[in-house]
Amino acid sequence: MSGPRLLLGFDYGTRQIGVAVGQAITGQARELCVLKAQNGVPDWSRVEQLVKEWRPDAMVVGLPLNMDGTPSEMSERAERFARRLHGRFGLPVHTHDERLTTFEAKGYRLAQGQRDGYRRRPVDALAAALLLEGWLAERPAG
C-alpha cells in the first residue's frame, strides 16, 4: 500500500486544538482529545506523546479558509502550525480545507442531544475527525 495508513488530524485553534486519528484503509477517523493552546501554541510534549503513542505515517491540519476559498489569518496560522509539526516530527504533514467542519460537528452534537453548550464536551476533536475523513475521502485507499 502506498501513502499513509494511519494519520493524526488536527483542528487548529488559538485556545484549543482538536485531535483525531484515522485509518486510510477504512477511510474513517475518530476523536482523540482536545489540547489546550496558548495563542495557538500547544503543549508540544503532549503532541509528542500522541505521536509516540499512535505512530502516524502522516498528519493532516485543517485550514480554516474564508467561505470564498481565500486564505484567512487563521489559515495562515494553521499552515505555520503544520510546518512546525513537520519540523518537530519529520513526518509528512498535509493541509485540508476545513470550512464548516466545526459547524457540522456542532450540528452532530445537537442531534445527539447535547444542549448544554460545548465547554463540557467540546467539538474540536470531532471537527478534527471530520476534516481527516474529508482528506481521506479525496485519496485512494491503496
From Swiss-Prot:
EC number of this enzyme: 3.1.-.-
One term of GO molecular function: nuclease activity
Subcellular location field: Cytoplasm
GO terms, biological process: rRNA 5'-end processing
Stored InterPro entries: RNaseH-like_sf (IPR012337), YqgF (IPR005227), YqgF/RNaseH-like_dom (IPR006641), YqgF/RNaseH-like_dom_sf (IPR037027)
GO cellular component, one term: cytosol
SUPFAM superfamilies on file: Ribonuclease H-like (SSF53098)
Family membership noted in the UniProt record: Belongs to the YqgF nuclease family.
Name of the featured protein: Putative pre-16S rRNA nuclease
Record lineage: Bacteria, Pseudomonadati, Pseudomonadota, Gammaproteobacteria, Pseudomonadales
